From Swiss-Prot:
Record's protein name: Protein P
Residue ranges occupied by any Reverse transcriptase domain in the UniProt entry: 346-589
Compositionally biased tracts (Polar residues): 205-220, 251-263
Organism: Gorilla hepatitis B virus (isolate Cameroon/gor97) (HBVgor)
Domain notes: Terminal protein domain (TP) is hepadnavirus-specific. Spacer domain is highly variable and separates the TP and RT domains. Polymerase/reverse-transcriptase domain (RT) and ribonuclease H domain (RH) are similar to retrovirus reverse transcriptase/RNase H. The polymerase/reverse transcriptase (RT) and ribonuclease H (RH) domains are structured in five subdomains: finger, palm, thumb, connection and RNase H. Within the palm subdomain, the 'primer grip' region is thought to be involved in the positioning of the primer terminus for accommodating the incoming nucleotide. The RH domain stabilizes the association of RT with primer-template.
Gene for this chain: P
Keyword Ribonucleoprotein applies: no
Activity regulation summary: Activated by host HSP70 and HSP40 in vitro to be able to bind the epsilon loop of the pgRNA. Because deletion of the RNase H region renders the protein partly chaperone-independent, the chaperones may be needed indirectly to relieve occlusion of the RNA-binding site by this domain. Inhibited by several reverse-transcriptase inhibitors: Lamivudine, Adefovir and Entecavir.
SUPFAM superfamilies the UniProt entry points to: DNA/RNA polymerases (SSF56672)
PROSITE patterns according to UniProt: RT_POL
Physiological role: Multifunctional enzyme that converts the viral RNA genome into dsDNA in viral cytoplasmic capsids. This enzyme displays a DNA polymerase activity that can copy either DNA or RNA templates, and a ribonuclease H (RNase H) activity that cleaves the RNA strand of RNA-DNA heteroduplexes in a partially processive 3'- to 5'-endonucleasic mode. Neo-synthesized pregenomic RNA (pgRNA) are encapsidated together with the P protein, and reverse-transcribed inside the nucleocapsid.
Amino acid sequence: MPLSYQHFRKLLLLDDEAGPLEEELPRLADEGLNHRVAEDLNLQLPNVSIPWTHKVGNFTGLYSSTLPIFNPNWQTPSFPDIHLHQDIINKCEQFVGPLTVNERRRLKLVMPARFYPTSTKYLPLEKGIKPYYPQDVVNHYFQTRHYLHTLWEAGILYKRETTRSASFCGSPYSWEQELQHGAESFNQQSTRIFSRAPVGPCIQSKHQQSRLGLQPQQGQLAKGQRGRSGSVRSRAHSATRRSVGVEPSGSGHNNNSASESASCLHQSAVRQEAYSHFSTSERHSSSGHALELHDISPSSARSQSKGSVFSCWWLQFRNSIPCSGHCLSHLVNLLEDWGPCTEHGKHHIRIPRTPARVTGGVFLVDKNPHNTAESRLVVDFSQFSRGSTRVPWPKFAVPNLQSLTNLLSSNLSWLSLDVSAAFYHLPLHPAAMPHLLVGSSGLSRYVARLSSNSRIHDHQHGTMQNLHNYCTRNLFVSLMLLYKTFGRKLHLYSHPIVLGFRKIPMGVGLSPFLLAQFTSAICSVVRRAFPHCLAFSYMDDVVLGAKSVQHLESLYTAVTNFLLSLGIHLNPTKTKRWGYSLNFMGYVIGSWGTLPQEHIVQKIKHCFRKIPVNRPIDWKVCQRIVGLLGFAAPFTQCGYPALMPLYACIQAKQAFTFSPIYKAFLSKQYATLYPVARQRAGLCQVFADATPTGWGLVIGQQRMRGTFVAPLPIHTAELLAACFARSRSGANIIGTDNSVVLSRKYTSFPWLLGCAANWILRGTSFVYVPSALNPADDPSRGRLGLSRPLCRLPFQPTTGRTSLYAVSPSVPSHLPDRVHFASPLHVAWRPP
C-alpha cells in the first residue's frame, strides 16, 4: 500500500497522536523501513531516460550562461578620497588605551596588506578588457576605461609609467618609496617633461647619476648599453619619436646608462607612447617582459618626422584625407586640442619590475539587482584560485546561526552603518603591484583583435593606407555617441595603459579575509571603549546596539567621529535604524531569537510553487534549490536532515525527482518557521548514555534504563538516549559523552531518525561529560544499584570561535611566556 502524506507525518512523529517514544523512535533507525519509505517517495530512482528539467522558476544550473545586459547609460560611481591613516594603531590607542594582542595583530595585517603568490601568469594587454558584450564592444571598452581612470584618480590604482616606476594620485604612505633624482625628489615640476617639456635642456643634463655616482655623458647617443628598465633592441633619436604633447627638448638624446634616473623614465615614457603607434612584438625576454621596437633606424625615423609627425594613432587621422562619410578623421577634426596622450599622477614611486601585461581581465555589470543605473567593475583574478598558480587563501571563522543569535539576540536598539567602498580602504604594498595588473591595449589594438578584418593584423600600423582599415560605420557611430559623454577624454582612453592595484581588489580571495580582520579589530576597539554597548561586524556590515534610542544616537555620533578620524568613509544616507529587530546577514534578530528575512521567506514560497512533480530536475538546479532551502533549514521542524535526499542526488550528480508526498512534506516544513532562540547559561541536571543494546538516563536523583530490541550502532543508540532524556525530562540542557550528538548534526543518521530527532532535540543544548564521570553510564549498562554523585556541569552559551567577535578583556599587565592558541585562521565555516 503506497505511503500517504498523513501516514508519513505520523511515521516521523510530527503529529501528537504518536505512540510511546521508546517504542516508536528505534523503529525509525531500521534500514529496511528507511529503504521502503525512500522507494515510496521515489527518492532513490535510478537514472531515467526522461529529459532533465534545467530551469525551476528563476533557478537555472550553477554554470548556466545567463547573458548579462549592457546598459549604455551606466553611471560610473564616484569614489571619495579614501585614505586610511597610517598611524591607525596610535589613533586607536589614544581612543581606548593599549590595544590587545589580537587587535594589534589584525591591524598590522592591513597596514599595508601584502600579497605574494608563488607564480603569476601574464596575459597580453588585449585581454585586459573582456569582450563580455559582443554587441557593444566599443561602448563597453570606453565605459570600462573610464571606470579604471576614475579608480586611478581616486588613488585606488597605480599607473605603470615604466618597468620600474609607477604614478598615483592621493596621499602617499611611508612604504611607497618616492623616486629620487639626485638629491631632489621627483615632484610635480619634474613630471612636466611627460606632458610638455620646458624649453631648455632635458632633465637628463650634462651629468647622469648611475649606480657608480655622477658620470659625464658618453657621447650623443650611447647605443650599446642596456637600461635597467628593460631591453629595447633598436633605440631611436628622442626628437624623432615625437609623441603628441611631448616637445623635443634642446639636447634631448637618449643616453642609456645603467641608471634609474630620468633618462630611463623619459625614454620609457616615450617608448610606451611609441608602442601604440609602431609595429611592436611583445616577447617574454630573459631580462623581463620588454617591448621590442622593430625596423626603426634613426634615418627612417628622421624622414618620417619631416613628413607626418610620428604621433599617436588617434591624431594621425587629423592629417589624413577622409576615406568615406564615416571616416574617423571627421571625428578627430571636431576638436583642435584633444589633450595629452597620457596623464601622470602627483606621486612617482619605485616598484618591482612590472611587465606591460595584465594578470586579470575586467568588465562591467550592474551595481546590484536593485541598482541598474550604476555600474560595478568585476575583476577576474581567477588565476590565483585555479591550476598551478593557485594560492591557498587564509580561512577565517564566520559565526554560525546559533553563535550569532547568542550574541545579538537581546533587547537592544540597533542601527547599521554603511562603509562606502570598504575594500578600497585597505592599502596594498607596492610589491604586490606586478601580480595584480589590469589595463587595456588601446582602442586600435582592441578593435583590431575583435575585428575579422585580417588587414589590420599586418605590420604596418604606422602607414596611412592601414590607418583607414579601422573606419567602419559601427565604430564611427559609437565614437560619435561616446564623444557626447566623454568629450576629449576619448583620445586619452584610446591609448594603452597598465594599472596595478594600490588598495585591495575584490577579485582576490585574500581581500575578504583582510576586510574581516580589519573590521573585527575596529569593532573590538569600539566595544572596549563603550563596554555597555555592542558593536559587531561581518565584512563591511557594521552594527551598533545600545539600551535606548537616545543612548544609541549618542553612541552613533561618537563612533562615527572615531571612524572618520581613522580615515574610514561612511555613507550617512545608508545608515539604517532598525529599532529592536536587527536585520543582519539575511536574518531578523530580536529578543525572541532569529528568523530569516521576509524576502527570503517569499523566495522559498515562490520556489515551491515552481517545483515540478514527477519530473527529473538537473542536479545543478537542485544545488540552487538546496542553497535557498538550506539557509532556512534551521528554522524548520526537521532541519537539514529533511534535505538529505536532495544532497545525496547532488553528490551522485544525478537528476532528482520530487514525488508529490516529498514536495508536500517539504512545503509544509517551510510554511511554518520557528525562531532559533538564544541559549541560556545553566546547570546540567539531566544525563544520557547508551550502549549498543541499552540506554540509561539520570534526571536529577531519578535513574532509569531500557533495552533496544536489536543491537544498534553506538552513535544511533546515543542519539536515541538523548531524545528519550529530552522527552521525559523536558530539560533543555543535557549531558552526553558522544561527540556526534554533541555536534547536533543529524545528517549522517538513518534519514527518518535524523528528521524525527531534529524536531525532538530542537532548542536543546548539550554539555560534554567524560564517560568516567557520566552518572548515566551505569544505568545504560543495566546497573541501577550504584548511585554515582552528580557532577556539577555548568553550561555556558558560546559565541563561536570566530575572528569577528573576540571578547576584549583589559590588557594583562605582563604577557605569559608562551601563549597556546588554536588559530582561527585554519577553521573553515561549515553550516551549523
